[in-house]
Swiss-Prot record:
Name used for this protein in its record: Ribonuclease P protein component
Complexes and interactors: Consists of a catalytic RNA component (M1 or rnpB) and a protein subunit.
This protein's record includes keyword Hydrolase: yes
Top-level class of the enzyme under EC nomenclature: hydrolase
Annotated organism of origin: Shewanella denitrificans (strain OS217 / ATCC BAA-1090 / DSM 15013)
UniProtKB keywords: Endonuclease, Hydrolase, Nuclease, RNA-binding, tRNA processing
GO cellular component terms given for this protein: ribonuclease P complex
Pfam families membership: Ribonuclease_P
Family: Belongs to the RnpA family.
Enzyme Commission number(s): 3.1.26.5
Gene name as annotated: rnpA
Amino acid sequence: MTSYTFSRELRLLTPAQFKSVFSNPIKASSAEITLLAIPNIEQHPRLGLTVAKRFVKRANQRNRIKRVIRESFRLNQHDIPALDIVVLVRNGVMEMENADLNKLIEKLWRKLSRRYNG
């Protein structure tokens, strides 16, 4: 049976792991969100999130955005290639409803997969 958990092994945890993604990444972006990714040696994708206070002032809004992105990753993790992915949130995402944010992030997962696979 396929597991849909979001365990510790599916997360980017250390600053070194985040930093490695910023060197020569594969990009997929929209006006509100940018995904940066590099291939990893694991058999599964890993996710790191950054939601800057500069763009989303309130903690509850930052947490909502991260929750929606994590949930989308959890449900789509088996369709995403083995990449280390950092999600950068920019201006404009705070005004988005959860459903719209979910649609946007799923579109970006597909775009990233296409760019990685060629």
